[in-house]
A protein has these predicted regions:
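Active-site core of metal-dependent hydrolases
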Residues: 148-158, 169-277, 288, 297
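Active-site gating loops and adjacent loop-to-helix segments of metal-dependent hydrolytic enzymes
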Residues: 62-94, 201, 219-237, 255-258, ...
Length: 403
């Protein structure tokens, strides 16, 4: 396949050849080269790696349903109970809602997804099954990892552990944990279960951390100890963790250094939080960092629309970035930053200036988007997009193509 007249990361006009699902040639654009039936006319658009949403709750999405007033009360437990009371209040099959949101994400340029699937004594495996069905339905258009996620805690309701283990038996890719100290109030037992199941089923771990200040640092230190003791370097992600920068500068620096040493990744949803670890320092230190949309128009929040380019703008905005190099870094995070969380084989960001994902040998998961520069694309978030997964066009003009 030839992709003609595109600008990789805003560089010179180029023609890109795809073979075997990877980029095989990047050469100066030659208008005289004819297009074949399977080739793509770039029309001077930007060529970027496709987006990687590594923190999304497909299991709770309401995209496609009538908009409703937000009724959740503050706090993790209050929001979770709001979801529990309401998520079945529709005649639309849950699997169809989940699949519709995933389709919308693919159409807008996301081809790598790590989705939570809530597992507890209320929903049992219903939400997990819905996400699994969507994963299978769009297996040719996107790579989806499913995290079995104890949204209601692990220790608070008897039977939760059994459902978590059953989901791992049925193919969950990642073992989730949440607020070991604040929610379950027994971080040792909580982490015993999380790390024990991950080891038993040979999956990675993602810890959802909303805990504030010193408490969040304490829980994080317990995770660090286990990663070091169990040799799980490169297999753990800390999600949210938006208070870890609020204790003092020395603690922040120590945590960043330990994350880099132990290859612990971080995933953010670009919150308006003041106590986050420095994004520039994390990337400069080699910490894998990814972006996600979190819940999308669900019982937790009315935000989210399936477009990770919008969330890239939010990441830049909430970090008060103005310089092009920092805004482009946000694009690199939203694309290859997340890809490196989902696969150790993906190119990593090596610093603020790094723009991986469009070189010879890279996997041909790509998105063509209109924009004068990568920064302008983040500002304007145009809709003229063509999406490739494994070297095949899977979406064009915000529509997923049939295969």
């Amino acid at each position: 396949m030839l992709i003609r007249d595109v600008r990789p990361w805003g560089g010179p006009a180029s023609d890109v050849v795809i073979e075997g699902g990877r980029i095989s040639v990047v050469r100066p654009h030659d208008e005289s080269v004819p297009l074949g039936a399977e080739d793509v006319e770039g029309r001077g658009r930007l060529l970027l790696p496709s987006f990687s949403d590594v923190h999304v709750h497909l299991d709770s999405t309401r995209i496609g349903l009538p908009f409703r007033e937000h009724t959740g009360s503050p706090g993790v437990w209050g929001m979770m109970m709001n979801d529990r009371r309401n998520w079945r209040d529709t005649d639309v099959p849950h699997a169809e809602i989940v699949a519709g949101t995933l389709e919308r994400m693919i159409a807008r340029g996301t081809t790598r997804v790590r989705s939570y699937a809530q597992v507890d004594v209320d929903c049992k495996l219903e939400k997990f099954d819905a996400v699994m069905a969507a994963k299978e339905r769009f297996a040719d258009q996107a790579e989806v990892q499913i995290m079995t996620f104890p949204q209601a805690g692990i220790l608070l309701e008897e039977g939760t552990v059994d459902y978590l283990e059953e989901s791992l038996k049925q193919g969950a890719d990642v073992m989730g944990g949440i607020d070991p100290s604040q929610l379950d109030r027994d971080p040792v037992k909580h982490l015993d279960i999380v790390f024990g199941l991950a080891e038993k089923y040979q999956v990675e771990i993602d810890i959802h951390l909303h805990e504030p200040g010193h408490l969040g640092v304490f829980s994080t230190e317990l995770v660090l100890e286990r990663v070091r003791a169990l040799g799980m370097q490169g297999k753990v992600t800390m999600s949210h963790a938006y208070e870890l920068g609020g204790v003092n500068e020395a603690t922040s620096r120590r945590l960043i250094d330990e994350f880099a040493e132990l290859d612990i990744a971080m995933a953010s949803v670009a919150p308006a939080a003041r106590n986050q670890l420095s994004l520039v320092d994390l990337v400069s230190s080699g910490v894998r960092f990814g972006l996600g949309e979190d819940g999308q128009r669900d019982y937790w929040s009315p935000y989210g629309n399936g477009d990770l380019l919008d969330r890239t703008w939010q990441l830049a905005f909430t970090n008060n970035f103005r310089r092009d190099e920092h805004i482009e870094m946000c694009l690199a995070i939203a694309t290859m930053g997340g890809a490196s969380i989902m696969s150790q084989a993906s190119p990593r960001l090596t610093g603020v200036q790094d723009r991986p994902g469009t070189a010879v040998g890279d996997r041909a998961d790509l998105v063509l988007v209109d924009g004068e520069t990568p920064t302008s694309a983040v500002m304007d978030r145009g809709t003229d997009r063509t999406v490739l997964h494994d070297g095949r066009v899977v979406a064009d003009g915000l529509r997923v193509l049939a295969h």
